[in-house]
Amino acid sequence: MKTKLTVLITFIILVLLGFWQLNRLKEKKLFLASMQENLTSPAIDLAKIQDNLPYHKVKITGHFLPDKDIYLYGRRSMSSEKDGYYLVTPFKTDEDKIILVARGWFSNRNKNIITQATNDQPHELIGVTMPSEKTRSYLPANDIKNNVWLTLDLQEASKVLGLNLENFYLIEESKDISNLDILLPLSINHLAAIRNDHLEYAFTWFGLAASLVVIYRIYKRSVSSRGLETRSRIKQDKSSF
């Protein structure tokens, strides 16, 4: 009886997990459709989308803050030199908001030249809003002393730069004001290619539930078979007296 109850509870949990993944599948489809629409639509003023900020194409006007650059380490397969950094600079808008902007990628050998990229000339830029990155336990901590960042944690960046940063950053889509050839532009195409694996996850949970039923039935047959053999042996022993 105890085994049957355990199997039943486990089966219910597995089935519920399967339906939960189907619900997540629906939510992810709606999210991806909304994100695709946002990314392909014309850029709109940031002030008009204060809710649900991530993954919107926006335009902002203001200027970069010099001497505040962050070098975010990242490999780039399309470049002949794989190792390099994303140039991330705080941008102060005309509304006095300060937003980190990922402006482009440069190779490791150009690290000393890239300091020429930032000036405080007023201009308008277009970019896609992105959520703050989370520190991963398997990644080393950011090397603040040498300005080598592995994670763009906006709370940490606020403390290091001494700025009150917004809780999102931008990937710049418009041509950077620096016009430096060594600063390669960034692409947002990968954002529309986010995988939606929740259907596979649902099949996995439902499959485990079905497997549990099969295993339990095999187990019951095995127990019943052993019980029949035992009773048969007892009868034979009694008949021998």
From Swiss-Prot:
The domain of life for this entry's organism is Bacteria
Q: How does it sit in the membrane?
A: Multi-pass membrane protein
- Statement: the UniProt record of this protein carries the keyword Acetylation: no
Q: Which family does it belong to?
A: Belongs to the SURF1 family.
Task: Write out the entry's keywords from A to Z.
Answer: Cell membrane, Membrane, Transmembrane, Transmembrane helix
- Give the source species: Rickettsia bellii (strain RML369-C)
* Residue ranges of coiled coil: none
Record GO cellular component, one term: plasma membrane
- The protein in question is named SURF1-like protein
Q: Does the keyword Signal apply?
A: no
For this protein, the record's InterPro entries field holds: Surf1/Shy1, Surf1/Surf4
PANTHER family, from UniProt? Answer: SURFEIT LOCUS PROTEIN, SURFEIT LOCUS PROTEIN 1
Subcellular location(s): the record lists: Cell membrane
Primary subcellular site in the record, as a coarse category: membrane
Q: Which residue spans traverse the membrane? A: 5-25, 199-219
